[in-house]
Amino acid sequence: MTSTVNLGSDTASKRTVIKSRCNSCCRILVSCVAVICAILALIFLVATIGLSVKLAFTVQEVHNCKQKLSGASTTTAAIYTTPSTMIEALQTNQLKLTTNERRSTPPDCLVEKKLCEGEVRYLKTKGCLGAREGEDLNCIDLVVECVGKPCGHNEDYKECICTNNGTATKCCYN
């Protein structure tokens, strides 16, 4: 005798096919989500590294600018008060001089002032330099352009000093 088992072939096979397709779709969907998350994580990582490098570069730039600004606004200089006063500036930007005085015999008056390692100077052969020209060390706050060439003939001065007020460079004797 033969016996047959009714497996509900139509209904059961349709259910198996649908279940198989759903599982396949779910696996594909999970794989796609994993790939998309990995790509987003990679983009975020690259962006973070790029911003870190840019920030480090900007911080270095700000540091360099601060160094340049501090160098431009304050210049350390050695000032010697002797029969003639010599001021040797380390930079030729805007000079704000700090005093470091060594006194020997105090002079009656200042007759010479040098800036920028002697390239630009006044030299008055008759009389004294006025306060604006260097007799008073508090008055020395000049924007100096070191030119090292005479500005012209004047019997009281061999050379003059040049100042820059931001718009023009002016050489003056008095």
Swiss-Prot record:
Keywords: Glycoprotein, Membrane, Transmembrane, Transmembrane helix. InterPro entries: Metap_SH (IPR035250). It comes from the Viruses. The chain crosses the membrane at residues 33-53. It is a single-pass membrane protein. Coiled coil: none annotated. It is found in: Membrane. One of its GO terms (cellular component) is membrane. Pfam families: Sh_2. Disulfide bonds: none annotated. Glycans are attached at N165. Its main location: membrane. This is Small hydrophobic protein. The lineage of its organism: Viruses, Riboviria, Orthornavirae, Negarnaviricota, Haploviricotina. The gene is SH.
